[in-house]
Amino acid sequence: EGIEETLRDVPADKVINAVPFYTRLWNETPKTDEERAEDQGTEAASYSMKVTSEALGMEEAAQRVSEAGATVTWDDTAKQNYAEWQGDNDSTYRIWLEDASSLEVKLGLMKDNNLAGTAAWKLGFETSDIWDLIQKYVN
C-alpha cells in the first residue's frame, strides 16, 4: 500500500524501498496494583496490560523463539513469520520476525514496482543469508 501511494507522486526510479534487519519482541504483562494506581486519572488507566518491547537482530530473534519453544507461523497479512508464547507473571510475548522470507516479499515488491533499489538498517543485525537474497533482487 505504501509503495502504491508513493508511486502516485514519485517516479519509481526515484523510490528506495527500506527494509529492516531487526524486529521487536513485544511483551504484555498485567499491570501491578501500584501501576494501576499511578495510571488513575489518565488514559492509561483504561488499559489493564503494560506493553514493552526490545529490538532484536534476526539471529537473536530466532534464538529467543527457539528457546521459548514457540511455534512459528506465517502471518499472511503482515507477510512475516509470527510467534507467540507465555512467559512468567502471566506475560505474553509476541514477535513478527524479519527473516529471509519476509525480506524476500519486500524485495519482490521493489522489483515488481521497478523501484530504484533498497536500503537496510541496522547493519550487523542481519543473518548471512540475507546478502545473497539482496543480491538476487538488486542485480
Task: Identify the role of each PLM range.
Residues K14, V19-L109, V138:
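Glycan-binding loop/region signatures in secreted carbohydrate-active enzymes
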Residues V19, K122-L123:
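Active-site proximal loops enriched in glycine and acidic residues that flank catalytic Cys/His/Asp
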Residues G2-T6, K106:
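A general structural detector for well-ordered alpha-helical segments in enzyme core domains, enriched
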Residues V10-I16, N113-T118:
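Loop/turn elements at helix/coil->beta-strand transitions in domains of secreted/extracellular proteins
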Residues T77, L109-D112, L123-N139:
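Aromatic-rich peripheral "rim/lid" segments of glycoside hydrolase catalytic domains that contact
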